Design a protein with these regions (language model features):
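Extracellular jelly-roll beta-sandwich "head" domains, especially the C-terminal globular C1q domain
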Residues: 85-133
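Extracellular receptor-binding modules and their adjoining Ser/Thr/Gly/Asp/Asn-rich linkers
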Residues: 2-75, 116-133
Length: 133
């Protein structure tokens, strides 16, 4: 086993959409780095706490948000992981939706999600989104 210690990793300009890819000795892709992530407050005035490749969050309506990417992905065929924290005195359970027919379809430059309890959209204090492609 070897240890790789570097300060900078650069993409190969001939690579797919300028993405850093990890490959084995035969050149088979084993993975890529996270393309975008964000942690934001979805209550009151929406505010980004920390992010990578996210330019802004649009507060569409109660419990509905659009994450806008700083640099668009090559297409909308990415995987999204979303978590949220919602609590009130009567309902501790919530769910997250991002493939809801009531929401705007994902694009290469944005991703819309909703947080809710039962069938009602609710704002969440902590929402995290991770995008892989």
């Amino acid at each position: 086993m070897s240890t790789l210690k570097v300060n900078t990793v650069q993409h190969n300009t001939s690579g797919f959409n300028n993405v850093v890819q990890f490959t084995d000795g035969a050149g088979t892709e084993n993975g890529t780095l996270c393309r975008a992530w964000v942690n934001f407050n979805g209550t009151g005035t929406v505010a980004i706490r920390a992010d990578f490749n996210v330019s802004s969050i649009t507060d569409i309506a109660l419990g509905q948000y659009t994450v806008n990417f700083s640099n668009a992905l090559s297409d909308a065929n990415y995987a999204a992981v979303v978590t949220s924290y919602y609590t009130n005195a009567t309902n501790q359970n919530g769910y997250i939706s991002y493939e809801d027919s009531r929401l705007k379809a994902r694009t290469s430059s944005s991703f819309t999600l909703a947080t809710s309890t039962t069938s009602v959209y609710n704002d969440s204090a902590i929402i995290s989104v991770i995008i892989h492609r």
